[in-house]
């Protein structure tokens, strides 16, 4: 799929997103600048749209980086324990720093996400049986252990209601003044683009990268820091969005290959389009109520994930 088609789809869905919601807004309301309707647009609809695009782009690119560095197509922030570690970090910030600002919570979540990701990579190094399906299963089990610890302490300290908002992604609470920290993902995405060629070389293996004169560990650490920071920002602002970083890079690699320089723009655009489409679907299925983005992406993403697994097995046969 060409970039211009993805870009056109993004524009069309973005315009549709502005007009879909409980409060009816028409094109004439915008043309005549209806004060009440425009207030809804600027306080709720526009911040929601921006956060959807930023989250979709950044999480998809995070998944692509993780798959390249781990050399496994089914590794992502969801299947490597990164998102679960970030969630644990948010809980720790609620327990220990009750008056912490969103930035301070994000830093704690980042530290935990980075620690969890590094731990997963260390586990990965020690596993001799590196089957494409086995590795993400290990990551899912690792993430479930962290998630269980999070739930235990949330119940113990009566914070289960607080942490529930981070268990499942939801854009319905995104409003002006409550999402701006997500903008920090933008420079991280830019750095990912600048390091695209290095990530591609690192994906060839440590020996290959070192022979080419590249500092493999430095590139690996930069990639993991980018993934961990983005995961912390998205979990803190929106909540967990499953499968996104897993399925989007796999879909793009089918028609663009594995070179990050070529696939990054397509991954970013398709990620934004996919999340935006799922969000719109969640808003119209049971209108005037809405389904959370975590549930919508989870249902659709799991189906796509199964298709990718079967497609891989078919080609292997």
Task: Give short role names for the model-derived ranges.
Residues 1-317:
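Alpha-helical transmembrane segments in inner-membrane proteins
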């Amino acid at each position: 799929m060409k970039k211009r088609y993805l870009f056109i789809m993004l524009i069309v869905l973005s315009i549709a997103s502005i007009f879909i919601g409980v409060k009816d807004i028409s094109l004439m309301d915008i043309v005549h600048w209806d004060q009440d309707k425009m207030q809804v647009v600027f306080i709720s609809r526009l911040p929601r749209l921006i956060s959807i695009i930023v989250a979709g782009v950044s999480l998809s690119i995070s998944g692509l980086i993780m798959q390249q560095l781990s050399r496994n197509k089914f590794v992502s922030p969801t299947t490597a324990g990164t998102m679960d570690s970030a969630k644990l970090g948010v809980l720790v910030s609620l327990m220990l720093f009750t008056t912490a600002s969103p930035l301070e919570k994000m830093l704690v979540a980042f530290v935990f996400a980075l620690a969890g990701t590094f731990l997963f990579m260390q586990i990965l190094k020690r596993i001799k049986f590196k089957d494409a399906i086995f590795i993400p299963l290990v990551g899912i089990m690792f993430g479930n252990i962290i998630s269980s610890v999070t739930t235990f302490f949330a119940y113990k300290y009566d914070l289960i209601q607080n942490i529930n908002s981070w268990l499942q992604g939801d854009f319905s609470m995104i409003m002006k003044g409550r999402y701006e920290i997500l903008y920090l993902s933008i420079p991280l995405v830019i750095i990912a683009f600048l390091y695209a060629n290095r990530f591609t070389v690192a994906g060839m293996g440590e020996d290959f990268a070192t022979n080419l004169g590249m500092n493999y560990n430095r590139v690996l650490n930069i990639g993991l820091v980018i993934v961990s920071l983005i995961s912390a920002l998205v979990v803190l602002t929106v909540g967990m969005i499953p499968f996104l970083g897993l399925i989007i890079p796999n879909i793009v690699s089918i028609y663009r290959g594995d070179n990050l320089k070529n696939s990054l723009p397509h991954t970013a655009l398709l990620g934004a389009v996919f999340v935006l489409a799922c969000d719109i679907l969640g808003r119209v299925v049971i209108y005037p109520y809405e389904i959370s983005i975590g549930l919508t992406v989870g249902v659709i993403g799991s189906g796509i994930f199964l298709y990718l697994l079967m497609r891989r097995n078919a080609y292997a046969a």
